């Protein structure tokens, strides 16, 4: 977006005497795409005390995902993801006192590519002018999480905690700079 289109210079560029913002649609028909995403999921959980001060929570989310992106530009690859994922979560909490806990948790989460990341064409970022090209071969990212936390409940609604965590990413979705 150029300064020529904002403020006093807009009169010279646009041939009008009004101030404002001018946006020109320079997109091409071939850069259109159709995308659909369906996610069907269920969740189950158990929360049970193991001892007076020890609590165990386990759960799993099961997701069936279908993601499809097709460009209007014939000859381009079709972006498609079809996955069935089981995402477990385990949590163990030990009550040191009635106001203090030690907690450890293990879980698996995921991140899916957006339609634009999966769509097989170049798009220009409106604000910065940066051109990004989607990759129809992207896969979803699986993330394994491990957390340790000390919690101190000062009063109702107030919490002080100290945490440490570890994350492992499988098939991370990353932006790659490829200058022309």
Predicted stretch roles:
Residues 53-56, 99-102, 157-160:
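Repeated loop/turn-to-beta-strand initiation elements of outer-membrane beta-barrel proteins
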Residues 39-95:
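Surface-exposed extracellular loop regions of Gram-negative outer-membrane beta-barrel proteins
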Residues 82-103, 107, 150-154:
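Transmembrane beta-barrel strand/turn architecture of Gram-negative outer membrane proteins
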Residues 23-30, 71-76, 85, 127-134, ...:
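Extracytoplasmic loops and strand-loop junctions of Gram-negative outer membrane beta-barrel proteins
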């Amino acid at each position: 977006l150029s300064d020529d289109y904002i403020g006093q210079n807009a009169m010279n560029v646009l041939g009008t005497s009004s101030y404002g913002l001018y946006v020109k649609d320079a997109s091409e028909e071939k850069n259109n795409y159709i995308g659909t995403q369906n996610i069907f999921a269920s969740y189950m959980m158990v929360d049970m005390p193991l001892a007076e001060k020890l609590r165990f929570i386990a759960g799993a989310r099961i997701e069936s995902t279908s993601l499809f992106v097709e460009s209007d530009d014939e000859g381009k690859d079709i972006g498609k993801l079809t996955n069935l994922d089981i995402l477990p979560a385990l949590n163990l909490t030990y009550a040191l006192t009635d106001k203090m806990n030690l907690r450890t948790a293990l879980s698996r989460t995921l991140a899916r590519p957006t339609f634009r990341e999966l769509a097989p064409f170049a798009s220009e970022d409106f604000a910065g002018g940066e051109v990004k090209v989607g990759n129809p071969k992207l896969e979803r990212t699986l993330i394994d999480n491990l957390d340790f936390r000390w919690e101190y409940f000062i009063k109702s609604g107030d919490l002080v905690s100290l945490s440490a965590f570890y994350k492992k990413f499988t098939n991370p979705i990353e932006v790659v700079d490829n200058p022309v």
